[in-house]
Amino acid sequence: MDFPSRFEVIVIGGGHAGTEAALASARMGVKTLLLTHNVETLGHMSCNPAIGGIGKSHLVKEIDALGGAMALATDKSGIQFRVLNNRKGPAVRATRAQADRAIYKAVVREILENQPNLWIFQQSCDDLIVEQDQVKGVVTQMGLRFFAESVVLTTGTFLGGLIHIGLQNHSGGRAGDPPSIALAHRMRELPLRVGRLKTGTPPRIDGRSVDFSVMTEQPGDTPIPVMSFMGNAEMHPRQVSCWITHTNARTHEIIASNLDRSPMYSGVIEGVGPRYCPSIEDKIHRFADKDSHQVFIEPEGLTTHELYPNGISTSLPFDVQLELVRSIRGMENAHIVRPGYAIEYDYFDPRDLKYSLETKVIGGLFFAGQINGTTGYEEAGAQGLLAGTNAALRAQGRDSWCPRRDEAYIGVLVDDLITLGTQEPYRMFTSRAEYRLILREDNADLRLTEKGRELGLIDDQRWAAFCAKRDGIEREEQRLKSTWVRPNTEQGQAIVDKFGTPLSHEYSLLNLLARPEIDYAGLIEATGGEAIDPQVAEQVEIRTKYAGYIDRQQDEIARLRASEDTRLPVDIDYSTISGLSKEIQGKLGQTRPETLGQASRIPGVTPAAISLLLIHLKKRGAGRELEQSA
């Protein structure tokens, strides 16, 4: 049979992690196979039709900065865009887009089908080919064998998936899709720690049965933001509003009186649900003092009447779902198109992974997305891109790569997962990053695109656009630095008139821009400068106004980096290190940290223990790198 069976990288799963993994590998010139159980669901948004949000948009921008598809697909499908925390500092500002579910999926599929070096094949994976602790390939449902140097598993909620509605349950990967049972059994045979997690989704509502006149309209921002560094507002489809309503005492009474019929509260569901996206029954139980909860009514797309009621995810029986939905203002006559449900699935302890997202026990086997205990499209996409990149690097015989915590939210995400593990679905927040003033969403390209080009992830068009932006920032900063304004001149008076800022002596425009009361646009207007690219202007203003804070963070990073990057030998025996308690020896032996920095973040590992590790490394000569940099 003349059918390709040998590839360099195989990606299992065509969700948000799988698509980014396959695209990253193929962009690097590696022959890549994407296996999916259904080509029609590539890039499907299983839960809410939205991309971005606090912490999450930072990941999307980083995926974009490394050449990924998520941000551009959002710009081409986004039907409402907003910047959250717009009145706060730039570190925590976040772009969020409501997407047309059908358009988003179509855009992702188009990108996949036009990517060189990428083959797509519709077949479920039932088995892994493993020889001498190295993955060699996969076996599909109909017995086809595909071989590769690296395999990336991005199975989402499909591994042993079990769907719950009330006290009834059935096998499923998500509503309408079969689970992956054979692969789940095979994975449990591997020497990896496995657990169960749970997530859920709300019932979908027919918009023609909803009274929007009693709800609060929530329009998008003007001017309309964009998600991708390569995007523009002209890409966006027609923009629409979302709406806000609330649960009430009657809603809460309905839920509370039926908790005995909830699979969560009757012990049927074993998996732990997401803390930061709780079901409505969980909200009522945990926040019993609250009289109401917000419900965001989000359109699913421009060509459908379906609405996504964000805030009432539930696995209660259907009759209870209907009653609680109709108790909410504006939805008294609501027609439910699809019931809400909860889904339980297998995940694997991410502490069994390296920074590359390769498993420690099976060479060439990489995990990305919900299989690692995360929740969210953005977290999945970020892991997929990293796993796909490292799978390709391995196939090419090159060293693996992962950004540090001070370089990217992707680095924070991976470090948290492989060091701390997770007992509940992990969601990204800006508060998880120590260096968030440096890790802003607006500068993701300046932080990562050069590295992406070096890795082979960035095409010529994106590289040219990046270089133009980077050079434009340098030119404008130099112009502002070398342009001086004197008191009692026409320009000086224009600045006084516009900002009420007296000039006691000569100032450069860069010094003036550092003042809190002076903004870049007003400064250019007052001094007669020419308009420049808004992205360039934004960077110049942020870098100037926050220069002191940014410099302090950079100094702190430089001090920590020497010990942070010191690698721990793979064969280190912690039980032989004098002075380490048995508890700490056990924690280090179980986690097997790759660097001293990672070891320092393991719960219970003290600064004194890190000092003992340093002494041990110097004794055996493994601390040479630290000594040279000191």
Curated annotation (Swiss-Prot):
How it assembles, according to the record, is: Homodimer. Heterotetramer of two MnmE and two MnmG subunits.
Cofactor requirements of the protein? FAD
| Annotated compartments | Cytoplasm
Residues bound to NAD(+): 273-287
Q: Does the keyword Iron-sulfur apply?
A: no
Binding residues for FAD: G13, G14, G15, H16, A17, G18
The record's function comment reads: NAD-binding protein involved in the addition of a carboxymethylaminomethyl (cmnm) group at the wobble position (U34) of certain tRNAs, forming tRNA-cmnm(5)s(2)U34.
Q: Name one GO biological process term.
A: tRNA methylation
Arranged from A to Z, the UniProt key words for this protein are: Cytoplasm, FAD, Flavoprotein, NAD, tRNA processing
Q: Name one GO cellular component term.
A: cytosol
Question: What family does the Swiss-Prot or TrEMBL record give for this protein?
Answer: Belongs to the MnmG family.
Instruction: Tell me the domain of life.
Output: Bacteria
Q: Name one Pfam family in it.
A: GIDA_C_1st
One GO term in the molecular function aspect is: flavin adenine dinucleotide binding
What's the protein called, per UniProt?
Answer: tRNA uridine 5-carboxymethylaminomethyl modification enzyme MnmG
* GN (gene name): mnmG
Provide the taxonomic classification. Bacteria, Pseudomonadati, Pseudomonadota, Gammaproteobacteria, Pseudomonadales
* Keyword Nucleotide-binding annotated: no
Report the source organism.
Pseudomonas putida (strain GB-1)
